UniProtKB/Swiss-Prot annotation:
Residues 37-51 have a biased composition (Low complexity). The chain crosses the membrane at residues 9-29, 328-348, 351-371, 417-437, 452-472, 498-518. Coiled coil: none annotated. Residues 37-56 are annotated as: Disordered. Required for the insertion and/or proper folding and/or complex formation of integral membrane proteins into the membrane. Involved in integration of membrane proteins that insert both dependently and independently of the Sec translocase complex, as well as at least some lipoproteins. Aids folding of multispanning membrane proteins. This is Membrane protein insertase YidC. HAMAP family: YidC_type1. Its main location: membrane. Belongs to the OXA1/ALB3/YidC family. Type 1 subfamily. It holds the Pfam family 60KD_IMP.
């Protein structure tokens, strides 16, 4: 068998398997985030601990609570048109509820459950939510304050705050006060329609001394029940360096100086604190007892002015609050490239007003950009197809002499200007594009509950009738049928014929938006191949005509 063709096969198979690996890894090896009903039974304030600015090995002692904490009660409620925020008696954000319709769709069923329901005569009895809670009931709450002094800390956790108002709306000021005898804590909060807020922490004491303390942005949201993306703590410092601590990876206390924002995230939502001070703040990452999930704290020694946000990781909303907050949207190793892809996709959405059509336009743009390379690759494959008979003759002639066969093959390629790997280059370049689009479409909360046409009512979940995956497989097979076949080994041909089936199987549970991209990509590739085949055929005829003349 021709060594170059063999290498060609291996390269293409490696690329194909790279795509399939995404599906396999996500489906079989990553665990979804636990739901709010699956959270631990331990009380957060009794079990979570943080480090102090000065302590190093006394984590289990610093900022801990040794006394029993009474069940916190509701202190204040801030109501918005599409959300509601509750403040508890310990001066923390108890819960954030989203009321926007796009976030209230029922949980997506698993593949087998969905198929079973699809062929069942029973109607879907799963009701939509009335409101979506973002925070776990028994996890670390945003705006919780802890002191280094254990006596003061325990007193703080057993002394309720008083509030200036019990009900208020956006842009109204809420003052929370806690009287600890010789020390009073005053939290001044202003919440806005976009769910970001301003926070001022002040103290009153006879000697004007401020004890060392920390404040937290809280445990990550748990609203996304089927997360196969990054979840944990993400922060950025003044050098624009981003640090990530994933769930189950918080094994020791970590300190990060000059931090600009501290965020805890799941697939679609975040709770964060940030500063406008160019010097930043010191962030401390602790580990939740039992799970080793990261818990974020800000270490403070003085009064503080901070800002926060709890809500969807919507690109435009975060950018409007502060451009640096768009870095909260995490795309993995190719974030720098994926973010550019999303910006282009978002621009196209603003132009057409539909995410499905925006994805199709994005695919067209990608194909146009890659066309010159695709053309060269297809020309090279066509030349290899024409050389197939001569290649077979050489294989028969130099059977058992691989070195001579290789040398004569290279001479043949050079003589006719053919490149055995030329057809793979466009496919190789599509790898980062595919991964970027995969990460964008899987992470973009903007696509949640976004309709396209007919049966596609949500581009963020799998096609309910599997029509797009089947079309994708058919279009991939169609593309194979119009692409020049340069393989001389029957086994190679059989393996390639299986690729459409494998892609269909492993992409069947992927978000409809991603499958729409791949289907459109295949159809455009077919059209492009037909055009190039026609161009090459015309050139071949013209060349033959010139020889006759």
């Amino acid at each position: 068998m021709d060594k170059n063709n063999n290498n060609n096969l291996r390269l293409i198979l490696a690329i194909a398997l790279s795509f399939l690996f995404i599906a396999l890894y996500s489906y079989f090896f990553q665990e979804p985030n636990k739901t709010t009903t699956e959270t631990t039974k331990q009380e957060t304030t009794n079990n979570h601990t943080a480090t102090s600015p000065t302590a190093s090995n006394t984590i289990t002692q610093d900022f801990s609570v040794t006394q029993t904490i009474p069940q916190e009660s509701l202190l204040s409620t801030i109501s918005f048109e599409h959300a509601k925020i509750e403040i508890d008696s310990l001066g923390r954000i108890k819960q954030v509820y989203l009321k926007d319709k796009k976030y209230l769709t029922p949980k997506e069923k698993g593949f087998l459950e969905h198929v079973s329901h699809l062929f069942s005569s029973k109607e879907n009895s799963q009701p939509s939510l009335k409101e979506l809670p973002l925070l776990a009931a028994d996890k670390l709450k945003p705006l919780e304050v802890r002191f280094l002094d254990p006596t003061l800390n325990n007193k703080a956790f057993n002394t309720p705050y008083s509030a200036s108002k019990t009900t208020l709306g956006p842009n109204e000021q809420l003052v929370l006060t806690q009287d600890l005898g010789t020390l009073s804590i005053i939290k001044t909060l202003t919440f806005y329609d976009d769910l970001h807020y301003d926070l001022k922490i002040a103290f009153k004491s006879p000697n004007n001394l401020i004890p060392s303390y920390v404040i937290t942005n809280g445990y990550r949201p748990v609203a996304d029940l089927d997360s196969y993306t990054f979840s944990g703590v993400l922060l950025e410092n003044t050098d624009k360096k981003i640090e990530k601590i994933e769930d189950k990876d918080a094994k020791e206390i970590k300190r990060f100086s000059n931090t600009l924002f501290l965020s805890s995230v799941d697939r679609y939502f975040t709770t964060l604190l940030f500063t406008k001070d160019p010097q930043g703040f010191e962030a401390l990452i602790d580990s939740e007892i039992g799970t080793k999930n990261p818990l974020g704290f800000i270490s403070l020694k003085n009064e503080a002015n901070l800002h926060g946000y709890i809500g969807p990781k919507d690109y435009r909303s975060l950018k409007a609050i502060s451009p640096m907050l768009t870095d909260v949207i995490e795309y993995g190793l190719i974030t720098f490239f994926a973010k550019g892809v999303f910006v282009l996709l978002d621009y196209l959405y603003q132009f057409v007003g539909n995410w499905g059509w925006a994805i199709i336009l994005l695919t067209i743009i990608v194909r146009i950009i890659l066309y010159p390379l695709s053309y060269k690759g297809m020309v090279s494959m066509q030349k290899l197809k024409e050389l197939a008979p001569k290649m077979k003759e050489l294989q028969e002639k130099y059977k058992g002499e691989p070195q001579k066969l290789q040398a004569h093959m290279m001479q043949l390629y050079k003589k006719h200007g053919a490149n055995p790997l030329g057809g793979c280059l466009p496919l190789i370049l599509q790898i980062p594009v595919f991964f970027a689009i995969y990460r964008v479409l899987y992470n973009a909360v903007e696509l949640k509950s976004s309709e396209w046409v007919l049966w596609i009512h949500d581009l963020s979940i799998m096609d309910p009738y599997f029509i797009l995956p089947l079309l994708m497989g058919a279009s991939m097979y169609w593309h194979q049928s119009v692409t020049p076949n340069t393989m001389t080994d029957p086994m190679q041909a059989k393996i390639f014929k299986l690729l459409p089936l494998l892609f269909t199987i492993f992409l069947i549970t992927f978000p409809a938006g991603l499958v729409l991209y791949w289907t459109t990509h295949n159809i455009l590739s077919v059209l492009q191949q037909l055009i190039i085949n026609k161009v090459l055929e015309n050139k071949k005829r013209a060349h033959a005509q010139n020889i006759k003349e």
